[in-house]
Amino acid sequence: PFGPAAGPNSQLAQNIIAAYFAGARFFEVKTVQKMDGEELARCVPRPCILAADEGYNQEWSTELEVPQAQNEYIKAWCALKVLSKVYGLGSPDGFVFNMSVGYDLEGIKGEKVNSYIDNMMDASNTAQFKECLAVLTELFPEEKDFIAAISPRVSRSVTVSTLHGCPPQEIERIASYLLTEKGLHTFVKCNPTILGYKTARTILDSMGYDYIVFDEHHFNEDLQWADAVPMFERLQALADSKGLEFGLKLSNTFPVDTTRNELPGTEMYMSGRSLFPLTIEMCSRISRQFNGKMRISFAGGAEFFNCDKLFAAGIW
């Protein structure tokens, strides 16, 4: 199973549908948070994405309000159920929608994001779900019984997205809340800074990315390996006690300095193929630490040329 990680490419229903037709079956839909819409858009300098080679982006990149995002995901969910059956593209139950929420526990427990989570877990009472069933029945009357039986449970899993510098205690509180209070299979997104400055610098230099500039402050402020391992052990035990799955999303983007006017501002976040060597090193360390038993959702420079090798390594 593979598909788009949370980002602008998994924000609109038509993009999710296009990804499905291209073979994607796992969709980590765009992250939602309490600050949204125009309020969030005003905080993002433009342009906010550059992908000439390795990828760079500014923090955040959405103009949708949380209810609008929810509607996009419900539309995509219902459309894929019908399209998969009508066009014989695979099992109507053969794909997964994974929520992504951030960026602190207060915001996640607030009315806006809490309602989103509840509605994604059960969309049956939402106006959008009811409208989708009505429209699809009109378009495909021969499938009315199938359409009426479409599950309103759009998502049963979530990825925790936190800002760089988020304290480990806050990360654990968020994940624990989602496991215990929401009953969701939960993945925690990790930052490449967990590798340490020296390792990250050595890896990127050896791969020809010596021109990418960063200092040590994010490495000092972000989650440390010594704090991460026992926290992940506790969260795994908690998930096991609830009959749920726990895992790690590898990896978040990598904060670097803006030195060549790539994007506005002094700092940006790296992704794409230059992130791959850092993320695969994270996978290796975590897999060794947890004897290959830690679930990993990989999203750090995965592409056509390395997907087969990732699967062969047992990352899927």
Predicted regions and their residues:
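Extended, H/D-rich, highly charged conserved domains that either
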Residues: 166, 170-183, 187-200, 221-225
